Amino acid sequence: MRRALSLLGVVLALCAATPSAQTPPKTLDIYYVDTEGGQATPFVSPTGQTVLVDTGNANPPGRDPQRIMEAMKAAGAKQIDYLVMTHYHGDHVGGFEELAKLTKIAHIIDHGPTVQPEQKHDAYDQALKTTPYTVAKPGDKVPVTGIDWLIVSAAGKTLKTNVAGAPGAGKPNPYCAEFKPKDIQSDLENGQSTGSLITYGKFRTIDLGDLLWNVEFDLMCPTNRIGTVDLYLTSHHGVDWSGSSTLVHALAPRVAIMNNGTRKGGQIAVDEVLESSPGLEDLWQLHWSFNGVTEHNPPGRFIANIEDAATTAAIVANPPPPATQPLGPPVPRAGGAGGAGGRAGGPAAAAPGAPQLGNPAHSPAYWLKVSAQNDGTFTVFNPRNGFSKTYKPRS
């Protein structure tokens, strides 16, 4: 009996000495909040710090800030330790005023003065007078414990040194040879976007805001300074002013997430670049895309928000004309959302006779959640249908 008790004691002691076997690994959690074609992305570090990239739209009033708060509550986040504002179009900064009433924003990081004075936001400008504030430059770090947050673009400038230790960084980019510049107005806030490369152990993800096509060349050529990534947030919501093969194919992401709206982004040219990207396993989207029609949307389990069956049938029966993007001045910020149909704001208007899609206040609205481990494993979860997929580290 004593021998049996002694052996039992050894077993219990061993179990007590190895709690890690029972404890889930700490993760970097990312919530791609549905802002109907804008951006609001909370990152919650393994130590509990929260970095929010952008604040979504102003209209409908309170919608996007409330969705951000719901994601933060789900993550157990108490405040925003750092707000990284990519640029000042209404679909990225519009929710700031209401969000600041709902939670503490401890520190703001942005690219500095706007290049489009008509895009000024008084509440944001006032907050900069009382909130700790940093103007980002390529090469700067956001001091988040346990992860490496590197600024790779800001104010039209890009990183000029190779990311130390990054897989593939410093090698010639073969996709530079196929780059063709686009005739895109250069003095836009999009091209000023504060872009971030976030690394947690062996997991790497990149968020470039709305960085423009021609600036992507400056970042990635002639040398790939970034290296490869595991997860790519499609630039500019999947609008074809961004997302060149020179960028995407060199990054060689395993997974892409598109923060599109029903009628904004998801353009076929962007989809084709993704579909031909070496090593891409899956595309996830916040919305079923009218622009992508049936041929280019991913399977439904990879989409956070889907229209009802009757609306989807109408989309299939009435495919849209080829999408175009205006090259003229920005549409005025009606209600602070960057314009109703311009490149900077909410979903584009439906073509005459096309089905009206995308209830802008629909509820519930679903995010996509990514949980990344420091060994490079990450899982994408779709709460609409409970579907998740885990991606093991690159071999």
Please give the residue ranges for each predicted region:
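Positively charged n-region of N-terminal signal peptides that target proteins for export
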Residues: 1-4
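Bacterial N-terminal signal peptides
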Residues: 6-16
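Active-site metal-binding motif and surrounding structural segment of the metallo-beta-lactamase
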Residues: 25, 46-52, 56-110, 114, ...
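Acidic/histidine-rich helix-loop elements
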Residues: 52-66, 161-185, 236-241, 263
